[in-house]
Amino acid sequence: MQKEIFIAGGCFWGVERYFQKVKGVLDTKACYINGGFEGVKYKEVCEGSSHVEAVRVIYDNSKITEEDLWKLYLRIINPYSLNKQGNDRGVQYRIGLYSYDKDLLKKFSDLNEAFMKSEGKKNYIEIQKVEDVTLAEEYHQNYLLKNVNGYCHINLDDIPEEYQKQ
């Protein structure tokens, strides 16, 4: 069954490219979400609109589970860093998982609660309902496919073999 999740892990270029390489992921789009209004532009996001850079991930949950997506997500973020991932700083780089689906939010919330319990401390991962979505400008879509030497704070090769697309 196809499902949709919005994944925020800092700059969306690396998040998008990372999940494009994961089996079961069918489509990705760089977006700005949950800033209170639609139609935002990159310049406004950089100037503090409160939107978060996120990647809409469409996946087949018969090929990759939510638990697997969670494990992979934890490989690419620092869950204890507020509004900063890699060299990127600002509220647009906060981390979280967002959805329209209440059951999906509950599942990820439970996974995060178990993670915090196992770590013995709180983290900054938001698990929230999607309120508003604006597709990022075309030059942001597939950025690291078009700019193979472009900036990325994520190790794009850090995908365990069992999760890699063939």
From Swiss-Prot:
Gene Ontology MF terms: L-methionine-(S)-S-oxide reductase activity; peptide-methionine (S)-S-oxide reductase activity
Enzyme kind, highest EC tier: oxidoreductase
Catalytic activity from the UniProt record: L-methionyl-[protein] + [thioredoxin]-disulfide + H2O = L-methionyl-(S)-S-oxide-[protein] + [thioredoxin]-dithiol; [thioredoxin]-disulfide + L-methionine + H2O = L-methionine (S)-S-oxide + [thioredoxin]-dithiol
Keywords assigned by UniProt, alphabetized: Oxidoreductase
GO CC annotation terms, alphabetical: cytoplasm
InterPro entries linked: Met_Sox_Rdtase_MsrA_dom, Met_Sox_Rdtase_MsrA_sf, MsrA_MetSO_reductase
Active site positions: 11
Pfam families reported for this sequence: PMSR
E.C. number(s) listed in UniProt: 1.8.4.11
Transmembrane segments: none
Signal peptide, first to last residue: none
Gene3D superfamilies, per database record: Peptide methionine sulphoxide reductase MsrA
Role, per record: Has an important function as a repair enzyme for proteins that have been inactivated by oxidation. Catalyzes the reversible oxidation-reduction of methionine sulfoxide in proteins to methionine.
Name listed for the protein in its UniProt record: Peptide methionine sulfoxide reductase MsrA
Annotated organism of origin: Mycoplasmopsis pulmonis (strain UAB CTIP)
Gene it is expressed from: msrA
